[in-house]
């Protein structure tokens, strides 16, 4: 952790060549030194926050894939045959998955058990910085991928890619 005087010594340039600015650690700092120290600290803070968001997104993205795999396997245990699972990234912490099923299975009572399982699964997986939700959609004559992409579902899960 750097001290304010470390920031000032390493990050502040003299305001004017003709004037001797107070040196860090003396009785006071010039306005320009304070502004420069603020900017330097702010830039370091933004970089740290960006790195933390990127790390959290990467972890959540990985987890959403793993969790979707678990749901697909459970749906198959219920006797359902998902055709595709498409991901939409809403934010760094929120993900939505659209699972397509044959129309006959979408109307089958087995889907009720799947909805119960998925609801419990979503609640158990949710944390302060991770939210995954699932939707189901019937398909009759295949999936119009262009329409799904226009709705933001652009990433296919590998378990169901043919």
Give names to the regions the model predicted.
Residues 31-81:
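Helical scaffold of the NTase/Pol beta-like nucleotidyltransferase catalytic core
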Residues 95-113:
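A short interface-forming secondary-structure element
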């Amino acid at each position: 952790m750097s001290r304010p005087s470390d920031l000032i010594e390493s990050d502040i340039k003299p305001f004017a060549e003709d004037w001797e600015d107070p040196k860090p650690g003396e009785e006071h700092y010039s306005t320009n030194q304070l502004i420069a120290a603020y900017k330097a600290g702010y830039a370091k803070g933004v970089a740290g926050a960006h790195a933390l968001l990127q790390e959290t997104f990467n972890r959540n993205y990985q987890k959403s894939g793993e969790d979707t795999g678990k749901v697909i396997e459970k749906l198959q245990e219920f006797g359902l045959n998902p055709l595709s699972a498409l991901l939409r990234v809403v934010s760094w912490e929120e993900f939505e998955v659209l699972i397509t099923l044959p129309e006959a299975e979408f109307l089958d009572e087995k889907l009720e058990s799947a909805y119960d399982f998925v609801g419990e699964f979503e609640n158990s997986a949710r944390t302060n910085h991770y939210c995954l939700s699932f939707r189901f959609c019937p398909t009759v004559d295949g999936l119009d991928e262009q329409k799904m992409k226009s709705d933001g579902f652009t990433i296919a899960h590998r378990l169901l890619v043919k």
